[in-house]
Amino acid sequence: MKYTILSLILIQFFASRAQAPKYSNEFLHLGVGAQAFAMGNAVAASSEDVTAGYWNPAGLTSATEWLQVSAMHSEYFAGIAKYDYVGVSHSLGKKGVLGFTFLRFGVDDIPNTTQLIDNDGRINYDNVTTFTAGDYAFMGSYAKSLAIPGLSLGGTVKVIHRRVGDFAKSWGFGLDAGVKYRLNSHWKFGLVARDATSTFNAWIFNLSQDMQQVFLSTGNEIPTNGLELSLPRFITGISYNHSIGNPDKGFNIAAELDIDATTDGMRNTLIKSNTFSLDPHMGVQLSFKELVKVRGGVSSIQQFKAIDGSSSWGVQPNLGLGVGIKGFNLDYAFTRLGAAEAGYYTHVFSLKFKLSQPKKK
């Protein structure tokens, strides 16, 4: 059954390219870091480490170490799809902070059964080959604190490469921008403009004559070269932080509420219209001495219709833990990908460590 599903991906993918896309480059919105996953991805205002290069580049100004490195691996749909992330940040002192983010979401060893039946009408399994469908993103970020205390700005340049075997490939380009303001030791605010100028992907298709014939015989349109656009998405976040006792020796609780505003029409969110949709999500973290952290969050507030025509609301719960020792952090999240009632649970682990500048001899 697993490989039957995989064999359908090729034709389904090309058929979707022949239509006006609504959800373009969605792999860029999955998120990074088990900490964020556990908090329902509500970190636009509180992200202050290397992962801020993805969530809100303005938050990189708090990554004051010479070098921070983070990595994550997760698998979806019973291991069919694999999602990987690597991030690096480097402090330039008063000149700001640089960041680099790499993302890959891919499905490997997909059976290509378009030539399963030969010219004589017989099934020939020797004609079945495999291919990989992979999405890649290379993101460079820069952030700097401004003269106004607590205010910082950041930006990210994104280069996107998507490939489906030897049949199709695309290159894309986009920009993200972020601002962050720390009011005091308790309150922080964040604003992010994803795909601020609209992100584009230029697709090029390379289908053999035999494959084109398969598309026509199965009632599918033959895709043509073209552009795919990702419209801007705006994320606002407000975070509250409170320490119980000495901040370095006691407990600390932090909570954040984010609202994602999409501009590509009606989506299945809490608040929606024909032009935009609003998707709130929130998270909370309880930590002790920065050593142990317990996290929880709620996201994907969506409406579902039953077979009898009735409808109900569902949410996606998220849980996680974190452990930190001397600049090394291990985070875990139990979350799921997809609709709140139909998604697949997955375990997400991420690592992060900090390095000081080597001393000159």
Language-model features: locations:
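Subset of outer-membrane beta-barrel
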Residues: 19-361
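Bacterial Sec-dependent N-terminal signal peptides
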Residues: 1-22, 284
